[in-house]
């Protein structure tokens, strides 16, 4: 199995407590670089999580030859920009919901994914939580 070597764009609460921790807990996946525009935040996050590389520029993280997949956990207004940058660099993208801030940006992301053949996935991790499974089961009964 090829190791997914993730670069995180964004070092906020989602990467700390929600989706982020799982990236190092599953087989074949490791976070190797993080990026925040705030240098102190990027450095602190990397140190606390024993990640060797940190950046303040998204393009530098995307261009890192050791990073082979990108996770975007920033405000939705920046999702399209970062997702398109990563796909154009040939790197698969996993982006926090919502995919983008508006319909036009969603269309742009999908278009670039189709043009490049690089996948872009939305982090709908909650659909597998027990509560949501129960809701789904109740809805399917009707």
Whereabouts are the PLM-identified features?
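N-terminal Rossmann-like dinucleotide-binding module
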Residues: 1-49
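A broad helix-preferring feature
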Residues: 9-19, 62-70, 116-118
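Alpha-helical elements of Rossmann-like donor-binding domains used by nucleotide-donor carbohydrate transfer enzymes
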Residues: 18, 44, 60, 69, ...
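Alpha-helical structural signal in soluble globular domains
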Residues: 22-26, 45-49, 84-89, 108-116, ...
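Short, well-ordered coil/turn segments that N-cap beta-strands
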Residues: 29, 68, 91, 118-119
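Structural detector of well-ordered beta-strand residues that form the stable sheet scaffold
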Residues: 32, 55, 94, 119-121
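Beta-loop-alpha module in the N-terminal Rossmann-like domain of NAD(P)-dependent dehydrogenases
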Residues: 52-112
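A contiguous active-site-proximal alpha/beta segment in oxidoreductase catalytic domains
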Residues: 100-142
């Amino acid at each position: 199995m090829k190791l997914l070597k993730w670069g995180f764009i964004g070092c906020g609460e989602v990467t700390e407590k929600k989706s982020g921790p799982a990236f190092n807990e599953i087989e074949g996946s490791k976070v190797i670089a993080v990026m925040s525009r705030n240098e102190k935040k990027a450095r602190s996050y990397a140190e606390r999580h024993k990640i060797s590389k940190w950046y303040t520029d998204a393009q530098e993280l995307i261009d890192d030859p050791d990073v082979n997949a990108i996770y975007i956990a920033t405000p939705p207004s920046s999702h399209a920009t970062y997702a398109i940058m990563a796909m154009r660099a040939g790197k698969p993208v996993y982006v926090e919901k919502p995919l983008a801030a508006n319909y036009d940006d969603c269309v742009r992301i999908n278009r670039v994914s189709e043009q490049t053949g690089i996948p872009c996935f939305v982090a709908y991790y909650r659909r597998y939580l027990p509560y949501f499974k129960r809701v789904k089961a109740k809805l399917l009964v009707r």
